[in-house]
């Protein structure tokens, strides 16, 4: 639940010299709303194609597999990056997708909220961070991560490489649909403490437009789209 909202808004209204408006406030009805038209009728398969094409533009590796092939796809990606150590979210979806044995490997660490300092240190030295995507924006090639217990931000930020597992059901057209879902969570009092939008590996460019990869995050990223269980 959202705490202290009423007292905060009362204070703002008081500083504005007027009472709070709690009734009669209507959302604007804009004459033109192109954000709702882009890819509005696209199927999940069509959104996968859009995402795959966008991954080329954002320098992100892309794979699509059935759920039974997911562990093999992870192993192939880890080998492709020459990685040895992994840190992953402590997320029930790993077990739902048959990756329970993967998590028990000596080379794999799980985020532990009971000792977040140690988890951050493990993320700093890990070669690969692996998370699931909660919402996936096909148009921009963006994975959305909701932080919560077991799902630390450092897992996708600090390792040299990043792998996002994308259940096909999480695909939406663009930010429009993601914002709608987040607004719904807000209304239900279930807004995550932190929401991260990640579009491929870390990219920076100076005034001369020289692309530098990996300054603010992973050097490489891979999206693995998987059919839902």
From Swiss-Prot:
InterPro entries linked to this entry: FTHF_cligase-like_sf, LUD_dom, LutC, NagB/RpiA_transferase-like
Name the UniProt record assigns to this protein: Lactate utilization protein C
Taxonomic superkingdom: Bacteria
Family note: Belongs to the LutC/YkgG family.
SUPFAM superfamilies the record matches: NagB/RpiA/CoA transferase-like
Annotated function: Is involved in L-lactate degradation and allows cells to grow with lactate as the sole carbon source.
Any Gene Ontology biological process: lactate metabolic process
PANTHER family: LACTATE UTILIZATION PROTEIN C
């Amino acid at each position: 639940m959202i705490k202290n909202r009423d007292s905060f808004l009362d204070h703002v209204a008081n500083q504005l010299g007027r009472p709070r408006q709690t009734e009669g406030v209507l959302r604007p009805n804009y004459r033109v709303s192109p954000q709702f038209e882009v890819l509005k009728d696209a199927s999940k398969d069509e959104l996968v194609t859009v995402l795959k094409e966008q991954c080329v533009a954002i320098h992100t590796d892309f794979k699509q597999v059935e759920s039974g092939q997911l562990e093999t796809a992870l192993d192939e990606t880890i080998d492709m990056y020459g990685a040895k150590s992994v840190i992953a979210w402590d997320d029930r979806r790993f077990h739902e997708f048959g990756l329970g044995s993967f998590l028990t490997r000596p080379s794999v660490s799980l985020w532990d909220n009971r000792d977040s300092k140690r988890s951050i240190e493990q993320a700093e030295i890990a070669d690969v961070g692996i998370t699931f995507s909660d919402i996936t924006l096909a148009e921009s090639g963006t994975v959305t991560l909701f932080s919560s217990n077991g799902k630390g931000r450092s897992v996708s930020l600090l390792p040299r490489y990043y792998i996002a597992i994308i259940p096909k059901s999480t695909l939406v057209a663009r930010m429009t649909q993601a914002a709608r879902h987040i607004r719904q969570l807000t209304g239900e009092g279930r807004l995550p403490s932190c929401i991260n939008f990640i579009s491929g590996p870390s990219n920076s460019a100076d005034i001369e437009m020289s692309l530098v990869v990996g300054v603010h995050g992973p050097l490489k990223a891979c999206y693995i789209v998987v059919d839902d269980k």
